[in-house]
């Protein structure tokens, strides 16, 4: 029998065990990580050779949650796991982002990482174990990989950082931050926060990086005893002669092209130069270099041109200095029939953002492995190919769109009103209509404006900005509001969103090692300046939320009844509530605690439904006079309905002062009568009287 090799370490309040050698032995690397009964299996397989003509690194990362891990059977007809959930997609990206930069340049072999959740403790999210497991599996596989990485979640409560807080602890934490990196460098940060200062955010990153060393050390110890021999892979030898020839043919033109400030014109010019250079080096040439080889060198020329200019203090591609935000144009209320809308344009990046208000029935039901729950706030980000002037696949939501949408959602959620204060379900959709960098942050700005245009009482406006970095040795430049090319050719993508009072979301992806605390400090401070500049323009366009929601949005009324009366409102088989909704044109939602939300396109309908519910749930008062309707005649009296669902007995002796021989001589079915309640008993039976009113009137 195979023997498992294990390494155990303490990580915050958790005990973590790394295990390899028993399961999935045919994979290139396989590690099981157990964190307090949350168990994940990470496997890595790499092709021994790159495909001919391959010109990019084909890394795929898939994180998969199995329902059996939480002792559940999937819903749906087929009773098996289906397409990836949003949580699975986001966690796959979380694993991918810090490991991708650690594969060597020129390594184009296909690599597949699969992480499977096998057991779930509901208090321990599987994402941090998954990142550690993927890092460990890569490290023991022998595949060229400049790791390992560690990963940590950091919370913040009562002025203290929390290492790997539980799900319960996160409910009271003002911060939920995930940081990943190597022993010497931070590579990735993903977070949401409740208006924390830049200093607290930076401190959390540094704290997480310090604490993750325990995970990195444990992985290194596992590699020492269980690691496979390192691959004898060497990067392709540089073709210095070809590099010199490409420079000779293209460098001067590339430098000139990067003085064109319009993105489309610049892109077209660079494409012309690239095609011309390839043709000059390949047409009719024996043993000509491959197009991919020439393209790689051409990209190096582009990067070198942009980077050297910025580090030398020259203007950026579009003529700005390092701290200037592109021109901003804002319009709100741009779509006539939507509940809230905004068109936010920053340079050549534009987002049309729409907010829609719905009822509780519109909440998104999430069937997660830990259990079903509902989301009252959704943000969807769409990035069609026309936004960059290209053709491409359309209609299928891509991983990037899901990731950008979640980042924008994180930025805005802290400023939303609580459900008890604003009971609407909220959906925000960001349609990216133009893109030249920072479209997710444009979605944050446009989303904040659209929500306020819809009348959502946001606590404050939220703005977002994307920062970049160019670093060469000890020289570096932090760039405010980066363009697409600056993101592509730079060393860091650093997105910060927040209010005037603090940060609500932070995302960082670093492509190189050696980013110091000081550099991150400069980037955060510069991002703060840019954010405040954008917030001022947003507040000039729409300072506070509209006083009321759109005329096209449903009207909501909230009320509370005695929980024992819920069945009276619902009625047998739902008959009462169905009839009530049809008559008043409303949607009525009832919670187990007696909370009721009434929604309607008209305020009148909602008020009418509320009054009817108050009648249904009203307590019958002894001595009170009611306007009732005779519903049935009996030999010994009549049944009179005095409130919805509440009937009482009008005994023959209580109809008139004289003797009544035939009840039908005095009252008819359907007749409206005034009656007084004489008594109610413990079983809810009600005795009524008409005679008592006759005597009172006579008196």
UniProtKB/Swiss-Prot annotation:
Record-annotated residues binding Mg(2+)? 487, 493
Q: What is its main location?
A: cytoplasm
Q: What is its EC number?
A: 2.7.7.8
GO molecular function terms here? 3'-5'-RNA exonuclease activity; magnesium ion binding; polyribonucleotide nucleotidyltransferase activity; RNA binding
Q: Give GO cellular component annotations, separated by semicolons.
A: cytosol
Entry keyword set: Cytoplasm, Magnesium, Metal-binding, Nucleotidyltransferase, RNA-binding, Transferase
Which domain of life does the UniProt lineage start with?
Answer: Bacteria
Against Gene3D superfamilies, the record matches this protein to:
GHMP Kinase, N-terminal domain, K Homology domain, type 1, Nucleic acid-binding proteins
- Cellular localisation: Cytoplasm
Function, as annotated, reads: Involved in mRNA degradation. Catalyzes the phosphorolysis of single-stranded polyribonucleotides processively in the 3'- to 5'-direction.
* This protein's name: Polyribonucleotide nucleotidyltransferase
The species this protein was found in: Azoarcus sp. (strain BH72)
């Amino acid at each position: 029998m195979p023997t498992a090799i294990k390494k155990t370490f303490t990580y915050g309040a958790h005990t973590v065990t790394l295990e390899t050698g028993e399961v999935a032995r045919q994979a290139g690397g396989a590690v099981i990580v157990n964190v307090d009964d949350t168990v994940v299996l990470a496997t890595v397989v790499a092709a021994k050779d790159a495909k001919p003509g391959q010109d990019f690194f084909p890394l795929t990362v898939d994180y998969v949650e199995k329902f059996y891990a939480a002792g559940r059977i999937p819903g749906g007809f087929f009773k098996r796991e289906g397409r990836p959930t949003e949580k699975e997609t986001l966690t796959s990206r979380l694993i991918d982002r810090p490991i991708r930069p650690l594969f060597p340049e020129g390594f184009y072999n296909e690599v597949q990482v699969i992480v499977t959740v096998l057991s779930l403790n509901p208090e321990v999210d599987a994402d941090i174990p998954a990142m550690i497991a993927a890092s460990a599996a890569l490290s023991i596989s022998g595949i060229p990989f400049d790791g390992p990485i560690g990963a940590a979640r950091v919370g913040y409560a009562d002025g203290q950082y929390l290492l790997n807080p539980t799900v319960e602890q996160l409910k009271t934490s003002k911060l939920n931050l995930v940081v990943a990196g190597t022993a010497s460098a931070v590579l990735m940060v993903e977070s949401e926060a409740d208006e924390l200062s830049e200093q607290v955010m930076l401190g959390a990153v540094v704290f997480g990086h310090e604490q993750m060393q325990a995970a990195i050390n444990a992985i290194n110890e596992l590699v020492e005893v269980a690691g496979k021999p390192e691959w004898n892979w060497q990067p392709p030898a540089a073709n210095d002669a070809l590099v010199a020839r490409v420079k000779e043919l293209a460098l001067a033109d590339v430098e000139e092209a990067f003085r064109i400030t319009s993105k489309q014109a610049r892109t077209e010019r660079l494409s012309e130069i690239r095609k011309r250079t390839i043709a000059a080096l390949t047409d009719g040439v024996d043993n000509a270099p491959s197009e991919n080889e020439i393209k790689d060198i051409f990209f190096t020329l582009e990067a070198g041109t942009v980077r050297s200019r910025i580090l030398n203090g020259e203007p950026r591609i579009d003529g700005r200095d390092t701290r200037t935000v592109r021109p901003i144009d804002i319009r709100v209320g741009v779509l006539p029939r939507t509940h809230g809308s905004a068109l936010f344009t920053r340079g050549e990046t534009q987002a049309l953002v729409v907010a829609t208000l719905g009822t509780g029935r519109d909440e998104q039901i999430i069937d997660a492995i830990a259990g079903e729950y509902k989301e009252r706030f959704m943000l969807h980000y769409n990035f069609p190919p026309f936004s960059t002037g290209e053709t491409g696949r359309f209609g299928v939501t891509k991983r990037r769109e899901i990731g950008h949408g979640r980042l924008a959602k994180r930025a805005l959620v802290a400023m939303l009103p609580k459900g008890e204060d604003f009971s609407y379900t909220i959906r925000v959709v960001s349609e990216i209509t133009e893109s030249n960098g920072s479209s997710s942050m444009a979605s944050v700005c446009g989303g904040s404006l659209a929500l306020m245009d819809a009348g959502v009482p946001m606590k404050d406006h939220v703005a977002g900005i994307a920062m970049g970095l160019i670093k060469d040795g000890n020289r570096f430049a932090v760039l405010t509001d980066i363009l697409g090319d600056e993101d592509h050719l730079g060393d860091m993508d650093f997105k910060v969103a927040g209010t005037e009072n603090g940060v609500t979301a932070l995302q960082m992806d670093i492509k190189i090692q050696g980013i110091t605390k000081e550099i991150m400090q400069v980037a955060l401070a510069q991002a703060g300046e840019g954010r405040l500049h954008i917030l001022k323009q947003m507040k000039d366009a729409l300072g506070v939320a509209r006083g009321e929601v759109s005329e096209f949005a449903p009207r909501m009324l909230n009320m509370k009844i005695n929980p024992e009366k819920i069945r009276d409102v619902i009625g047998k088989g739902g008959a009462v509530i169905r009839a009530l909704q049809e008559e008043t044109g409303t949607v009525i939602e009832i919670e187990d605690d007696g909370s009721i939300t009434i929604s309607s396109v008209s305020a009148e309908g909602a008020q009418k439904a509320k009054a009817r519910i108050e009648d249904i749930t009203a307590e019958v008062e002894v001595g009170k006079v009611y306007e009732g309707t005779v519903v049935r005649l009996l030999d010994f009296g009549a049944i009179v309905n005095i409130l919805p669902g509440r009937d009482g007995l009008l005994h023959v002796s209580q109809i008139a002062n004289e003797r009544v021989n035939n009840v039908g001589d005095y009252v008819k079915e359907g007749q409206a009568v005034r009656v007084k309640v004489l008594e109610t008993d413990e079983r809810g039976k009600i005795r009524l009287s008409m005679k008592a009113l006759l005597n009172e009137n006579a008196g």
